[in-house]
């Protein structure tokens, strides 16, 4: 079976299960994940034969998607604010509409940073993947560095495995964010300039 044949069959199966979604897009994403090839490579070399090992992997991935499992959970990753983030079933999948929250928080932060405070603190409650905290850190770190302002971004979550996941996302994106296990403010000290959730 070639890339082209698998894409057509998978897209048809996905469209039958959920006609409102674009089965072709999901099929292509699964094929990229299973083969490690880019979209361009797959489409340019669509007559490439799929070996047995990859075909078995594709069958398992497609079965999960046909059962309604979100693509992000299948891949274990979702991009948010141009940051690749690991996700798990213990976290919500970062959504594009959450970027509106990040934009608003950035607007408020930039206004407050005009006053050149020596220290600026942000708290993300129920951080999950760390998406909001990491997006804010990615934007504000360079600004604070230029202005000689100490930036502290802290994310808290109740579940220890979620805190580990958020920390791995910080490391993956080389961002300085502290993640703590806490029930809301329980293990957090001090005051914050911005609190998001």
Kindly label every feature range from the protein language model.
Residues 100-197:
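Conserved SAM/SAH cofactor-binding pocket of Class I
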């Amino acid at each position: 079976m070639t890339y082209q044949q698998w894409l057509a069959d998978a897209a048809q199966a996905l469209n039958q299960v959920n006609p409102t979604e674009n089965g072709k897009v999901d099929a292509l994403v699964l094929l990229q994940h299973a083969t490690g090839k880019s979209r361009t490579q797959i489409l340019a070399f669509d007559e490439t034969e799929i070996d047995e090992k990859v075909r078995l992997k594709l069958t398992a991935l497609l079965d999960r998607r046909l059962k309604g499992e979100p693509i992000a959970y299948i891949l274990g990753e979702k991009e948010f604010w141009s940051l690749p983030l690991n996700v798990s079933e213990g976290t919500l999948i970062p959504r594009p509409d959450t970027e509106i929250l990040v934009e608003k928080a950035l607007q408020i932060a930039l206004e407050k940073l005009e006053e050149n405070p020596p220290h600026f603190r942000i708290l993300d409650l129920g951080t999950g993947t760390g998406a909001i905290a990491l997006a804010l850190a990615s934007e504000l770190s360079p600004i604070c560095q230029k202005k000689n302002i100490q930036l502290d971004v802290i994310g808290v979550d109740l579940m220890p495995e979620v805190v580990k996941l958020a920390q791995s996302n910080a490391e993956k994106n080389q961002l300085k964010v502290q993640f703590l296990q806490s029930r809301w403010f329980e293990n957090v000290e001090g005051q914050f300039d911005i609190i998001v959730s």
